Amino acid sequence: MSAALEKPQIIAHIQKSLNYTVFESKWIPCSAKFVCMGNFARGTGVMQIYEIQHGELQLVREIEKSKPIKCGTFGATSLQQRHLATGDFDGNLNVWNLEVPDSPVYSVKAHKEIINAIDGVGGLGIGDGAPEIVTGSRDGTVKVWDSRQKDTPVVNMEPTEGETKRDCWTVAFGHAFNDQDRCVCAGYDNGDIKLFDLRNMSLRWEKNIRNGVCSVEFDRKDINMNKLVATSLEGKFHVFDMRTQHPSKGFASVSEKAHKSTIWQVRHLPQNRDVFMTAGGAGNLHLWKYEYPAQRSKKGADDVEMGVAGSVNLLQNVTLSTQPISSLDWSPDKQGLCVCSSFDQSVRVLIVTKLNTV
């Protein structure tokens, strides 16, 4: 067999045009359904649930809301309830029962401006401790919410007095390997990456990567921090080895410039934490594998342990659209099944083959 065929292939299985701008698509856990979130041209928000049936997409339900919906997560819900938490253009955090979506089961005015990003942990059997939701907004704040607590966040991470407010573009939970430890990573428009330790209520680490940070994700939320990928505006992404933190040098990292345009998102494969996909502004997807170095840490000149970065290998890439792919989500249940949505107002179901051989 030729080498090209032995590599994973990214196959566009189903494509569907939509009559609205779609910002996020998420698989509904334990199902062949996914939900798309966005806004109609008339300025209202929309959630559509699609089901894959006989190789086609069937619209199961369409829900219209007063405000455009920017982002969503199932990360803080149980597998039984499967409630969707969303952030909208008005700064509202809502949690919906998609079976009865008329009014939210939890609602709070979370931010003064648009909620750009949302993540959840402690639900779906992923991560120990209480289910929590984190939101990041244009108002410069990052807040952690517990849906059992009305109106006020559990944690509010905001700039100190006199510090300029930066637009927060992306948030992610990690390090939730027991019921005390938990971290939030946030990325900002000026290139800042900040790692907040929720156990000690402190800023554990910060770094500037010089370009706006579009997406951050830990390779797993529910383990002792292992790796973090951050993507940016100029087509560059960084992989940080989070196992060893040097007091002054921080975490070791490797960077790669793959796309010629903004990398909108990164998503790790749920079944293999060393494989991840990046989604680009020119409508392309790149599939990567991280290779660990022979030794992940070494003693520096000051006799203090420091991390050693590995390398990244490009497994496959494909161009699906002329417009940015703004959202990407792997199926947690079926390896290689993936949904992505683009600013060409369409949603695509992809199949990535041979992932068990990489």
From Swiss-Prot:
WD repeat coordinates: 64-106, 116-155, 163-206, 208-250, 258-298, 320-358
UniProt keyword list: Apoptosis, Cytoplasm, Repeat, WD repeat
UniProt entry tagged with the keyword Cytoplasm: yes
GO terms for cellular component: dynein axonemal particle
Main location: other
Molecular function GO terms recorded: ubiquitin binding
Pfam families in UniProt: WD40 (PF00400)
InterPro entries for this protein: WD40/YVTN_repeat-like_dom_sf, WD40_repeat_dom_sf, WD40_rpt
Keyword Cell division on entry: no
Gene3D superfamilies: YVTN repeat-like/Quinoprotein amine dehydrogenase
GO biological process: apoptotic process; axonemal dynein complex assembly
Subcellular location(s) of the protein: Dynein axonemal particle
Subunit and partners: Interacts with PIH1D1; the interaction associates DNAAF10 with the R2TP complex. Interacts with several dynein axonemal assembly factors.
Job of this protein: Key assembly factor specifically required for the stability of axonemal dynein heavy chains in cytoplasm.
Name under which the protein is recorded: Dynein axonemal assembly factor 10
Gene from which the chain derives: dnaaf10
